[in-house]
């Protein structure tokens, strides 16, 4: 059945997805794929398919925040996608994390609203260990500079307590801040 927001259905037969937030990032992803085909564009959800090293891959933008990312992942699940990797940016909370370096997230502080709609707040937001391990190995193979650990998922980009909140989580060893990971991991 065609999904309401991503406008895709199970006839795609794709099991793997890459999820940037920004629809414009799909152009950069498309440059790495073969046999690229634009699929749909509805609201923040732009999609394309292609092949990477012989494997069919779907790229789907999710917009900003856990609510829209949650919609994307639920609808991807409905059409048979079994693994998704979120790519994008985060605000670094630790010195020594440089632009372009990878933050590989093991878990998220659930300071958002979207993740709490799925499970109670006491439930941890943690990565799938198998998929996480694949990401670590791929990063090593590429020679990427990586930082592994926890991120802080929050609800709002701009609010008065943001600076104090960032300092607090930085002292706790949290690597970065975003708005999606907690929802995606629950």
What name fits each language-model region?
Residues 23, 91, 152-157, 183:
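Glycine-rich beta-alpha junction loops
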Residues 86, 105, 147-154, 178:
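Short, conserved beta-strand edge motifs with alternating hydrophobic and charged residues
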Residues 178-186:
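Short glycine-rich, acidic/polar surface loops and turns
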């Amino acid at each position: 059945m065609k999904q309401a927001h991503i406008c895709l259905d199970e006839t795609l037969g794709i099991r793997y997805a890459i999820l940037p937030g920004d629809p414009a990032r799909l152009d950069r992803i498309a440059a790495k794929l073969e046999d690229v085909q634009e699929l749909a564009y509805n609201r923040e959800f732009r999609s394309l398919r292609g092949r990477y090293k012989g494997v069919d891959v779907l790229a789907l933008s999710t917009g900003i925040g856990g609510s829209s990312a949650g919609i994307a992942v639920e609808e991807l699940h409905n059409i048979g996608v079994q693994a998704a990797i979120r790519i994008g940016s985060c605000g670094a909370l630790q010195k020594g994390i440089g632009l372009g370096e990878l933050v590989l997230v093991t878990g998220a502080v659930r300071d958002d609203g979207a993740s709490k709609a799925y499970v109670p707040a006491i439930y941890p937001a943690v990565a799938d260990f198998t998929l996480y391990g694949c990401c670590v190995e791929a990063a090593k193979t590429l020679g990427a500079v990586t930082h592994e650990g926890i991120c802080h998922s929050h609800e709002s980009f701009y609010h008065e307590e943001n600076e104090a909140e960032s300092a607090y989580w930085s002292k706790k060893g949290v690597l970065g801040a975003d708005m999606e990971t907690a929802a995606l991991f629950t």
